[in-house]
């Protein structure tokens, strides 16, 4: 069983989350932090698997992404820093308020592992598992990937986000990335 939530951040944005409940006794809670431009629905089958194995799982869309997207893609509140400081912190507050007896763990995919340090209340996690949370710094890449990454960070992302107010999802292979987030990412 799962249910949907709408949580309010300290700066009054709505964060859409989904809670996956186990049918058996709850072993612990897990918060899944998504990758850049990836909707929470991408993790649905994994969250269901974890719930079937006794874990209460929370997935959510960061501000500007998926169900948490807003019309104004140039809103200055849309930053990657806010994903950790406000969005993740809000989800952690909900988790510890509604399920205070549980041990909480976090799975961070890509930037989802990197933003953990930005949430002031991140000390609740008993463990953290990060998947592909490496640096995207262009000079760390090898071969043809190195100039491609350089072009993406210093040309494509800044130009597309300035022209359109976002980087179109088709370019990223995921959701559109609002301008402020895209420029911070680059």
Predicted regions and their residues:
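Conserved alpha/beta-hydrolase
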Residues: 40-72
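Alpha/beta-hydrolase active-site loop
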Residues: 77-98
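Alpha/beta-hydrolase fold active-site loops
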Residues: 27-28
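Active-site acidic short loop of glycosyltransferases
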Residues: 100-101, 125
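Alpha/beta-hydrolase-fold enzymes
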Residues: 107, 111-186
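Active-site glycine-rich loops that stabilize anionic/oxyanionic intermediates
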Residues: 32-38
């Amino acid at each position: 069983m799962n249910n949907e939530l709408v949580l309010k951040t300290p700066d009054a944005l709505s964060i859409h989350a989904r809670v996956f409940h186990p049918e058996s006794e709850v072993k612990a809670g897990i918060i899944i932090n998504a990758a850049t431009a990836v909707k929470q629905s991408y993790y649905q089958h994994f969250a269901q698997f974890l719930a079937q194995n006794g874990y209460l799982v929370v997935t959510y869309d960061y501000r500007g992404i998926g169900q948490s997207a807003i019309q104004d893609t140039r809103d200055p509140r849309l930053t990657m820093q806010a994903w950790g400081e406000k969005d993740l912190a809000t989800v952690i507050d909900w988790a510890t308020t509604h399920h205070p007896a549980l041990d909480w763990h976090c799975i961070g995919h890509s930037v989802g592992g990197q933003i953990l340090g930005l949430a002031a209340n991140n000390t609740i996690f008993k463990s953290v598992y990060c998947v592909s949370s490496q640096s995207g710094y262009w000079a760390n890449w090898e071969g043809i990937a190195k100039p491609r990454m350089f072009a993406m960070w210093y040309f494509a992302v800044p130009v597309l986000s300035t022209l359109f107010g976002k980087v179109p999802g088709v370019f990223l292979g995921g959701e559109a990335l609002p301008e402020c987030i895209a420029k911070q990412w680059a």
